[in-house]
């Protein structure tokens, strides 16, 4: 006796409707699906991707942990935003499990405030890390579209409401955060210092900097100091 079986294809839509951010099983399933898809469908020129971008749905990289620089065991967390930002990206790429582990390695390469020390540390973990100081907003979006968070350096001091520009001051010059997403109005970031006040400058350290939103107009003024292709960022890939 013959038994006929009918193979019914799965519809992908229900799976993504009930996606749980951070669920390891779902992330593994998506990775498996990605590996089985033709390369031509995984380019930023693919028709489905262009439709996705114009739909108004924001782009976000999942799986980036949040580290507060003020939790540093060194006692100097107030000046270690660069370490914490780099550690978040390194942890996303699964080469470290804590910011203190990252910091121990970084000390071999230089001071926390030095770009070359951070780039060298990331490279020592086997990552491809590149510092650029001619970054455009589009470059940030391209990196997020590719599924990679990136570190951005920006001027967090200066009160726009008083007509002041973004500035450096006696306490330091610049701050590093990790951008993990964007939509038409904001960039989504992990800020190791806490919640930034994009209009008045500075941070509220009593509030978490996890998944904060930075309005595009305010971020542009603090990131693109010398023109539309003048931003500082570190791009990291495996």
Model-derived regions, located:
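Extracytoplasmic/secreted envelope proteins and their assembly/folding machinery
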Residues: 82-90, 99, 115-119, 137, ...
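Active-site-adjacent substructure of cysteine-protease-like catalytic cores
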Residues: 133-194
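A structural signal for well-ordered alpha-helical scaffolds and beta->alpha junctions
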Residues: 82-83, 111-115, 133, 172, ...
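Mid-length scaffold segments of soluble, non-membrane domains
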Residues: 113-114, 120-135
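Structured segments of extracytoplasmic/periplasmic soluble domains
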Residues: 88-96, 121-128, 143-147
């Amino acid at each position: 006796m013959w038994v006929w079986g009918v193979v019914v294809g799965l519809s992908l839509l229900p799976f993504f409707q009930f996606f749980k951010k951070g669920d390891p099983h779902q992330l593994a399933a998506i990775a498996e699906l990605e590996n089985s898809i033709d390369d031509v469908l995984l380019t930023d020129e693919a028709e489905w991707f262009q439709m996705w971008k114009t739909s108004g749905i924001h782009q976000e990289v999942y799986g980036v942990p949040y580290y507060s620089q003020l939790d540093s065991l060194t006692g100097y967390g107030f000046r270690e935003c660069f370490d914490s930002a780099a550690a978040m990206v390194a942890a996303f790429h699964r080469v470290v499990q804590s910011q203190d582990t990252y910091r121990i390695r970084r000390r071999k390469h230089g001071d926390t405030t030095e770009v070359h020390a951070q780039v060298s540390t990331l490279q020592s973990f086997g990552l491809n890390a590149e510092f650029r100081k001619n970054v455009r907003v589009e470059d940030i979006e391209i990196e997020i579209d590719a599924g990679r968070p990136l570190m951005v350096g920006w001027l967090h001091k200066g009160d726009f409401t008083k007509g002041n520009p973004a500035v450096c001051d006696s306490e330091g010059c610049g701050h590093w955060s990790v951008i993990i997403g964007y939509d038409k109005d904001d960039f989504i970031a992990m800020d190791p210092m806490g919640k930034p006040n994009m209009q008045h400058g500075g941070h509220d350290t009593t509030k978490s900097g996890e998944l904060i939103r930075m309005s595009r107009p305010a971020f542009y003024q603090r990131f693109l100091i010398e023109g539309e292709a003048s931003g500082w960022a570190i791009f990291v890939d495996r």
